[in-house]
């Protein structure tokens, strides 16, 4: 395939973008990304929101002028244009940095419209900007986060939150769960399901034929043979052994505190952490500027900025 045909093929990819909270960082990040001309060479972007709202926010940030192609529907999107599906016509009041009902309402409207088009195959990929979980819930959003919402829409029980950088992939067994509830959320079957989803995603989405997966423990020092907790011996290790019985290359549980500073980090294709901060704190320390949040286990591609 020559370069011209390759670029032509890339432009066939319609990337839907939900704005996130209009009072937050989401629209700014979206607009600054769209100012990079490479975007229009690699896909056809479709933002779900309003030209008026985007122009208002555009005035508050530095950078080149942006010209939008207003669409009633994603099918009207044009190549080499920054397309905006008009989800609303009114001009909501924007209060930067404030978590309020307005931000929640319009973040949900944008997300609903984008996911509706995704389900109808009008877009090929979904990129979601950050939401305020507190305010979007007041607008009727009944899920802990994007990952759970998209899994429900796709009818997938075991979607997996995974942070991805060039040389680092970290997935989570539990994601938006209170720390006090993590232990009782861990089951052998649940951990096994997450290992299987991660293994399949590494094969299908990342082209790794025989992935190597490291699983972290839950307690300090991975339980120290039961002296600091039973989760490793009663739940995590049995799940790992069950996965090995399914011909998955997986090892652990490794003590989480030292793993990310050890040689072992580079011997695996992905790490499976037990809970949100256990996996995301070291990931963001090592790869915050390049990290992407990828939802594994879905029949579609969904990403968001590391945040």
Language-model features: where?
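Short, flexible loop segments at boundaries between secondary-structure elements
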Residues: 152-168, 298-307
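Ligand-binding beta-strand-loop-alpha-helix segment within the catalytic cores
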Residues: 163-192
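A generic local secondary-structure boundary/capping motif
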Residues: 73, 151, 159-162, 203-205
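Contiguous, glycine/small-aliphatic-enriched amphipathic segments in soluble metabolic enzymes
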Residues: 2-146, 189-274, 278-292, 296-307
């Amino acid at each position: 395939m020559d370069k011209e045909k390759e670029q032509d093929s890339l432009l066939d990819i319609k990337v839907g973008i939900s704005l996130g909270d209009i009072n937050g960082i989401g629209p700014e990040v979206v607009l600054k990304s769209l100012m990079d001309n490479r975007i229009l060479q690699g896909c056809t972007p479709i933002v779900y929101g309003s030209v008026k709202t985007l122009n208002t926010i555009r005035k508050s940030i530095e950078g080149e002028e942006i010209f939008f192609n207003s669409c009633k529907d994603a099918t009207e999107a044009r190549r080499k244009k920054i397309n905006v599906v008009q989800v609303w016509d009114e001009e909501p009041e924007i209060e930067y940095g404030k978590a309020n009902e307005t931000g929640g309402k319009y973040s949900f409207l944008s997300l609903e419209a984008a996911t509706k088009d995704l389900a109808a195959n009008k877009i090929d990929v979904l990129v979601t900007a950050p939401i305020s979980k507190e305010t979007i819930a007041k607008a009727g959003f009944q899920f802990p986060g994007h990952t759970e919402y998209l899994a429900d829409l796709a009818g997938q029980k075991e979607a997996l939150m995974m942070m991805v950088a060039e040389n680092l992939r970290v997935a989570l067994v539990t994601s938006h769960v209170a720390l006090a509830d993590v232990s009782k959320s861990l089951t052998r079957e649940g951990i096994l399901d997450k290992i299987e989803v991660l293994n399949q995603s590494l094969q299908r989405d990342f082209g790794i034929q025989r992935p190597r997966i490291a699983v972290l423990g839950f307690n300090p020092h991975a339980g120290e043979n039961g002296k600091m907790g039973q989760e490793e011996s009663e739940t995590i290790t049995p799940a790992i052994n069950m996965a090995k019985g399914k011909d998955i290359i997986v090892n652990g549980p490794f003590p989480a505190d030292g793993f990310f500073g050890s040689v072992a980090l580079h011997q695996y294709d992905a790490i499976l952490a037990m809970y949100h901060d256990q996996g995301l704190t070291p990931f963001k320390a090592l790869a915050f500027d390049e990290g992407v949040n990828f939802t594994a286990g879905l029949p579609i591609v969904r990403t968001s900025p590391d945040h």
